[in-house]
C-alpha cells in the first residue's frame, strides 16, 4: 500500500509508488478511519518525546523515503501517488511537515499528487478551521498551501 518497496519488481524495472502519509499522527490526525479513538496526541512538527527530543522529524522522513530514492538511482520510476493531511491537523503543523515531504520528494526526483485537490486534504474547500481563505471562483482557497505546492 505504498509504504514499502516491492523488492520482487526491482529486477523487472517496474515503476513503483509510495504514499507520503508518514507519520499518520500528522497526516491523519482525528481522521475517523485511522485515528478511531481520537488517541493521537496533538500534533507538532517535528513530533517530540516528553523530554523535548525529536521522536519523528525530517531525519525519519529521510529514512522513510530512502528506499525509493535508491530505486530512482537505479533508473526505476517512482511516483508518490498520495500525500496530504486531513483537515484536523493544525495548518502550521501541516505546512511544516508538507515542506519537508515535498523537499525530500524533489531531492529524490519523485513526482507527487495530493490525495485530493478539493476537499478535506486539499487546497480548495478543505474546511480547515485555522485557515484564512481566499475566494477563488466561489471556492475557499488555501493560499499558503497553494504557495507551498507551487514551490515544488
Spans of model-derived segments:
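Aromatic-rich peripheral "rim/lid" segments of glycoside hydrolase catalytic domains that contact
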Residues: 90-152
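Extracellular glycoside hydrolase catalytic/binding regions
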Residues: 1-108
